[in-house]
């Protein structure tokens, strides 16, 4: 679920081994989730479960903090705002210039938050600084690498092959 900085981003530090990147994911008022907090341990985390257990809902919540489109239908309680927050350990990586370029406070832990109000307004924050979705996508695109069930089928797609070669 969490990817390798070197292969996914220009924000790299090849001398540092990959460490635990996502520390915590908090989800409030999203789909069937009233409130959920997941603290990720060191090492590999695999989320499994039967059909209907909520794995895709968890990925949908993660998608919100990655800048994906928000949908009012995903509110658990339509009278309250939805909040998804991820805390990432970025201490091993040289990403301070990205924060400076975007006028965001830098810390060794990066807090990424997305809020969706019942009126449909969506707001994104990095370390409590409001950011637009492009900045959010750029940052989280470096922090998160999702691999889904049928991703291996892309290898047969010519445009995917060309992107990998280029």
Residue ranges and their predicted role:
Residues 1-19:
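Arg/Gly-rich low-complexity intrinsically disordered repeat tracts
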Residues 24-164:
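Gly/Lys-enriched N-terminal cap/neck module of very large, oligomeric protein machines
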């Amino acid at each position: 679920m969490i990817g390798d900085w070197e292969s996914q981003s220009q924000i790299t530090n090849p001398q540092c081994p990959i460490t635990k990147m996502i520390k915590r994911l908090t989800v409030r008022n999203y789909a069937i989730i009233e409130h959920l907090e997941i603290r990720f341990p060191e090492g590999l985390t695999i989320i499994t479960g039967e059909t209907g257990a909520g794995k895709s809902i968890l990925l949908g919540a993660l998608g919100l903090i990655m800048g994906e489109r928000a949908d009012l239908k995903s509110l658990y309680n339509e009278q309250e705002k939805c909040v998804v927050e991820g805390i990432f350990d970025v201490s091993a990586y040289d990403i301070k210039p990205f924060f400076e370029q975007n006028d965001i406070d830098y810390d060794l832990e990066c807090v990424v938050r997305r809020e969706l109000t019942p009126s449909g307004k969506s707001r994104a924050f990095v370390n409590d600084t409001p950011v637009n979705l492009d900045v959010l996508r750029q940052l989280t695109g470096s922090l998160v690498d999702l691999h889904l069930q049928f991703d291996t089928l892309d290898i047969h797609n010519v445009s995917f092959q060309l992107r990998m070669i280029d």
